[in-house]
Amino acid sequence: MVMMKLFTSPTCPYCPKAEKVVSKVAKEEGVLAINLPVNTDEGLKEALKFGIRGVPALVINDKYLILGVPDEGELRQLIRKLKGGEEYGAS
């Protein structure tokens, strides 16, 4: 199962666009996406775990990090590879 964690902030001007892209791709590709605002205890804890210092930031399967607003096509391509078991570096 592919899982995306989107780190956002209420004051971030780019986060609404990132949320829209991630939500659309998650729905259309049938994967789980959660929004973690960094101004909450849970969001901050998770962000620190991944070394995230700016938002928006997207973590996929606790392995892949995309900073900024993700490109819809590239995100969709990565998700399809992960769903197909073609993880980069997998043995």
Curated annotation (Swiss-Prot):
Localization annotation: Cytoplasm
One example GO MF annotation: protein-disulfide reductase activity
Keyword Transcription: no
Coiled coil: none
Pfam (any one): Thioredoxin_3
Chief location bin: cytoplasm
Disulfide partners: 12-15
Protein keywords: Cytoplasm, Disulfide bond, Electron transport, Redox-active center, Transport
InterPro entries on file: GLR_AS (IPR011767), Thio_glut (IPR004502), Thioredoxin-like_fold (IPR012336), Thioredoxin-like_sf (IPR036249)
GO biological process: cell redox homeostasis
CC per GO annotation: cytoplasm
Family stated for the protein in its record: Belongs to the glutaredoxin family.
Glutaredoxin domain sequence ranges: 1-91
Name of the molecule in the record: Probable Thioredoxin
